[in-house]
Amino acid sequence: MDIRPIIISLLISTCVQADRICVGYLSTNSTEKVDTLLENDVPVTSSIDLVETNHTGTYCSLDGISPVHLGDCSFEGWIVGNPACTSNFGIREWSYLIEDPSAPHGLCYPGELDNNGELRHLFSGIRSFSRTELIAPTSWGEVNDGATSACRDNTGTNSFYRNLVWFVKKGNSYPVISRTYNNTTGRDVLVMWGLHHPVSTDETKSLYVNSDPYTLVSTSSWSKKYKLETGVRPGYNGQRSWMKIYWVLMHPGESITFESNGGLLAPRYGYIIEEYGKGRIFQSPIRIARCNTRCQTSVGGINTNKTFQNIERNALGNCPKYIKSGQLKLATGLRNVPAISNRGLFGAIAGFIEGGWPGLINGWYGFQHQNEQGVGIAADKESTQKAIDQITTKINNIIDKMNGNYDSIRGEFSQVEQRINMLADRIDDAVTDVWSYNAKLLVLLENDKTLDMHDANVRNLHEQVRRTLKANAIDEGNGCFELLHKCNDSCMDTIRNGTYNHAEYAEESKLKRQEIEGIKLKSEDNVYKALSIYSCIASSVVLVGLILAFIMWACSSGNCRFNVCI
């Protein structure tokens, strides 16, 4: 009787009836992929893109403080007091300034604002100021206020810069005039003055009487004497002469003295700096909207918690670091190995080697079990939470590592300072390249660590179960354990939560192990006997065949003869 089918049936019956618990991890239908240092497009259950690419497309209030749009006035026209910009004179506070690159009202009289780029940079760090009169025009003595058709007010009347006074002769006299401004405000004060350079000596005499006038400006730390430079220059607004406007930031307690006998554009109004802070002067045609943002660029506001952005380098506020990469994905889940549908007797249950499970809820790692009550699955929340905490720490570490003190200054310089602009561009490009490379390398490294961490977590959970069960189960090597005793759902819970009582099931497990080992030994013995019988029969058949073949050969060659006697 062949006993092999009976042995196989017994083994199958043992496997089917055995209770089992498996350690595994989550698998999803996610299509997310990340890059690591060693691999590209690694499937993961979840990831986040660290680079923000969306913006509002508008100017917004920054942290609740509104910006100020200078309207038809340029920065220079506003700061010196172009009479066409009187609507801006009441400006006191802003989060940032917006300047139309093609604003028609700049310096109405031909000339320039000295160190314009530096003054713009200064105002990028000012959040509020107040306009105040420094020296009354009537206190200078026997001179008249000048006006020009180049600087008309809103009514079309000849006027001049509202923050300066252009003194010309009174009658046929222009005496030496002198005044001192003392800064007693307790704050920094912006003081402006200027010089008018006539077309010719004749024009100089007609305006100031003196043919070679001078202007002397002195403080406690420096003094400079200016002479008028006559000559015809390219002009506009009907003027061919030229004005140069200067400025200085006076600290509390400092004083400045002006002395002149012709050509002085004297200070009248200045600005008391009320509050310093980070600001910017943006130049773009986008509109102001009723919105709030944490980060503003010249193309729109950025409201995000992401670590990086690739919208614009010249950003203001609580902004993500600018990098050139359009996408940097950080793995926040596990390596996504699809579940294997055909897993023999245990169906969907499998270990960390074969693949993940699609049924885990509220967890990345967990257990599946099979017993008389059915099949169940449960997440291990503690190990999952630890992994989530580690990933949160990774994200925070990336933010901390990428925080720097570098700020772009590219947007603060006018066309005059082209060499500074070129240098600023090169510095910005170099720094951005470094930031972009560091960011990508950091994310690739963290992705490697994250995926390795998840593999280690599953193996640690597997080892924890193995130590808990000890000799009460057989480790199948694929993440599953065949229990050598009956284990209901309550028993399975104790294995999962670490309260399993090994001694309680030790005797039953010992007997079960002996039974299994006995069946295996008997099976092996029967197999050996069967093999011996088959070997003997096969050898006999071969021997008989050889003898018959020899006899037939001998007879056919005449060497063998049979005599039959009756």
Swiss-Prot record:
Membrane-topology annotation of the record: Single-pass type I membrane protein
Primary residence: virion
Description of post-translational modifications: Palmitoylated. In natural infection, inactive HA is matured into HA1 and HA2 outside the cell by one or more trypsin-like, arginine-specific endoprotease secreted by the bronchial epithelial cells. One identified protease that may be involved in this process is secreted in lungs by club cells.
Sugar-bearing residue positions: 29, 54, 182-183, 305, 488, 497
Note: Major glycoprotein, comprises over 80% of the envelope proteins present in virus particle. The extent of infection into host organism is determined by HA. Influenza viruses bud from the apical surface of polarized epithelial cells (e.g. bronchial epithelial cells) into lumen of lungs and are therefore usually pneumotropic. The reason is that HA is cleaved by tryptase clara which is restricted to lungs. However, HAs of H5 and H7 pantropic avian viruses subtypes can be cleaved by furin and subtilisin-type enzymes, allowing the virus to grow in other organs than lungs.
Protein family: Belongs to the influenza viruses hemagglutinin family.
Protein name: Hemagglutinin
Organism the protein comes from: Influenza A virus (strain A/Whale/Maine/328/1984 H13N2)
